[in-house]
Amino acid sequence: MDNQFIFKYSWETLPKKWVKKIEKSEHGNRFDTNTDYLFQLLCFLKLHTYTRFQVLIDICGVDYPSRKRRFEVVYNLLSTRYNSRIRLQTCADEVTRISLVVSLFPSAGWWEREVWDMFGVSFINHPDLRRILTDYGFEGHPLRKDFPLSGYVEVRYDDPEKRVVSEPIEMTQEFRYFDFASPWEQRNGNEG
């Protein structure tokens, strides 16, 4: 059974309200869904005889600050039975909570913690939603586009005090001027 058959069959079989948009490409197929139907769609893709996407490869997040629902959460699935991959995407904002899928894919707990830690997207009734990649005292979510590149605090080891200290970051340069003009566009017309 080829990838296109699985995709076409899934699309024809699924309730249309579950899927907002589909995309077929050489890099893999994609379903966009609403957060309300995420769990049902994942159940279908995992358990149906002609899909069998039983491996959750990854859950990752993307931040689009200009969108109303700025966070996109992407579920990458693999069907080892049919050698096929599919991406499932849903959107959320700071207050929208996404369905927990640990009951379907036990490894999802780790991925959901990572998405929460890096982006601040929360999951409904997650049993252990705490930081996984950043320090427990870390403030903010570092993969958000509005997170400052230098962070909020500096963590360093203080040798005289023999302990780790956190201090607010002090920028030595308060004002910077960025010249975005290309030096190639400023060339004299006489050169040549």
UniProtKB/Swiss-Prot annotation:
Protein purpose: Core subunit of the mitochondrial membrane respiratory chain NADH dehydrogenase (Complex I) that is believed to belong to the minimal assembly required for catalysis. Complex I functions in the transfer of electrons from NADH to the respiratory chain. The immediate electron acceptor for the enzyme is believed to be ubiquinone.
Lineage of the species this protein comes from: Eukaryota, Viridiplantae, Streptophyta, Embryophyta, Tracheophyta
Reactions catalysed, as given in the entry: a ubiquinone + NADH + 5 H(+)(in) = a ubiquinol + NAD(+) + 4 H(+)(out)
Protein name: NADH dehydrogenase [ubiquinone] iron-sulfur protein 3
Main location: mitochondrion
Keyword Transmembrane helix: no
Subunit structure, interactors included: Complex I is composed of about 45 different subunits. This is a component of the iron-sulfur (IP) fragment of the enzyme.
EC number: 7.1.1.2
